[in-house]
Every structure is written in C-alpha cells, then in structure tokens.
Amino acid sequence: TAKLIINTMIQKYGHDEGIQYLVDLDKNVEVYTKSGSGPSKNIGTGECTIGLGFLHDGIFQIVDQGYGNIELVVPSSGTSCEVGATAIFKGAKHPNAAKLWIEYALSPECVELAAQNGSYQFLVIDNAQQPEIATEFGLDPNNVMDYDFEDAKNNTDTYVAEVMEALGGGDDRFETEDA
C-alpha cells in the first residue's frame, strides 16, 4: 500500500512535487503502519484521526468490525488502484491442483463468495456481481486515475528510496519488520 501511495503521488503531481507532497504530509503522520489495512484499524480504535489506505479496508472496518467513527473520503481527482493477483509457482508439487484452484479463484462464484465475507473491492472477473456496498460507500470504478503500471514496475525502488531519504529515513514512526 505504501509503495502504491508513493507511486500515486509521483504520477499524479510529478516527481519533485510528488515527493514534496509526501514530505509535507509527513508533518502530520504519527505512524507508518506495516499493513495497508492498518490506518483504518487505527482510526476505528481511536489511535489516529486520519489514515491513508484502501477504501475497501475502511468499508470492512465499518461494516464488519462495527467502527461507526470512520468516514471514507474519496478524492474527486481520482484514486489509484491495485489489481489482486494469483499465480502458480514454478515447480509446484501439485500443478494440476494449482490450476484447478486458479480456475476457481478466477470464477464469479469465488469472488462473489469473497464479497459476502468482507472483501469489498470492485471485481474484474467477467460476469461477477459487484458488491453493492462498495458503491454505497463511494467507490466508483470510473473515478480511477490513469495509473502507469510500467512506471511503477521500473521505478518503485528508486521512488521509495528517494522518499525515505527526503523523510530522513527510518525513525521510530516506521513500523517495519526485521529483514
């Protein structure tokens, strides 16, 4: 999630302005969480008042966890997005079973089951029923910026290093796991 936010700001505002936006925003950041769902959890428990993260995680906190103190704000200028992926590992011990799983995972039946169990993303599977609650909370598949996945693939490591350098890199607000 953090890498997506960094890429989004740089793509949206340009390289230098995007990094400066994140530096300016940093003045208001108490903690950088380990997980993308962390900000909405921290709002729900009252640990912070604003969080950046995926809208579907916020919906989950409101609907499934009962946090009525969360309000979702969708930027009118558009949001970025992520595309969930699934794959078969090269050399998998059971490739036929893995193929069957992939076929099921990419079926409308499977993604609709996920939506019934707290996964409120918009679906990209043909013929799948979109979770209505996502629209009720303001998610709009037409309000997505033209995200450059190729730029992200080629430059994410550099962008992250530049942002960390600009922020002064790794004080105790950054919740990281030991490598």
Where are these regions (language model features)?
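A bilobed periplasmic-binding-protein/Venus flytrap-type ligand-binding module shared by bacterial periplasmic
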Residues: 7-11, 82-94, 105, 113-114
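Short, hydrophobic alpha-helical packing/hinge segments within bilobed ligand-binding/sensory domains
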Residues: 39-42, 48, 58, 98, ...
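Beta->alpha turn/N-cap motifs
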Residues: 36, 53-58
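Conserved C-terminal helix/tail region of periplasmic/extracytoplasmic solute-binding proteins
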Residues: 139-179
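Extracytoplasmic ligand-binding site segments that recognize negatively charged/polar headgroups
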Residues: 1-47
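Loop/turn elements at helix/coil->beta-strand transitions in domains of secreted/extracellular proteins
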Residues: 16-20, 46-49, 67-70, 96-98
